[in-house]
């Protein structure tokens, strides 16, 4: 597994969460995220392990409504276990965001850390 392949799977996962909150996306969590997964958004820690991710995503989905992910860039770092992804998140209830995220992959090929920054798109 390369970090860029993992980044693409992450964006597909986000797209699925944005489309529906059925159990299909829940099955993807242990395959994509390490048990010690950490999620940070705009400097705020949102999840300190994989088991907290489902609730965090459901809470965001309730507030934001459905959303669509449009991938813009995937840039590998010199370290082969890290990359930057940039995408647009267009939500039904909270508007559109230009998002930049640094993903870190663990030895097992799973996302260990996600540091996201959201910038609202003003149209």
Where are these regions (language model features)?
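Alpha-helix N-cap/helix-start motif
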Residues: 22, 49-50, 96
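A solvent-exposed, acidic/Ser-Thr-rich amphipathic alpha-helical stretch
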Residues: 26-74, 78
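A beta-strand edge to alpha-helix "cap/lid" segment located at domain peripheries
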Residues: 58-123
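Short histidine/acidic/glycine/proline-rich micro-motifs that form metal-
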Residues: 16-17, 43-46, 90
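Short acidic-aromatic low-complexity motifs
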Residues: 1-35
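Short coil/turn residues that cap or connect secondary-structure elements
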Residues: 21, 41, 91-93
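Compositionally biased, intrinsically disordered low-complexity segments
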Residues: 6, 20, 47, 72, ...
């Amino acid at each position: 597994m390369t970090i860029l392949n993992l980044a693409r799977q992450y964006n597909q996962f986000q797209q699925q969460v944005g489309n529906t909150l059925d159990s299909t996306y829940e099955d993807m969590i242990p395959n994509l995220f390490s048990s010690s997964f950490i999620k940070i958004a705009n400097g705020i820690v949102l999840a300190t392990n994989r088991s907290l991710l489902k609730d965090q995503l459901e809470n965001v989905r309730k507030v934001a409504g459905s959303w669509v992910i449009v991938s813009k860039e995937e840039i590998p770092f010199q370290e082969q276990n890290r990359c930057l992804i940039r995408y647009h998140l267009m939500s039904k209830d909270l508007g559109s965001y230009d998002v930049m995220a640094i993903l870190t992959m663990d030895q097992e090929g799973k996302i260990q850390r996600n540091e996201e920054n959201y910038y609202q798109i003003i149209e």
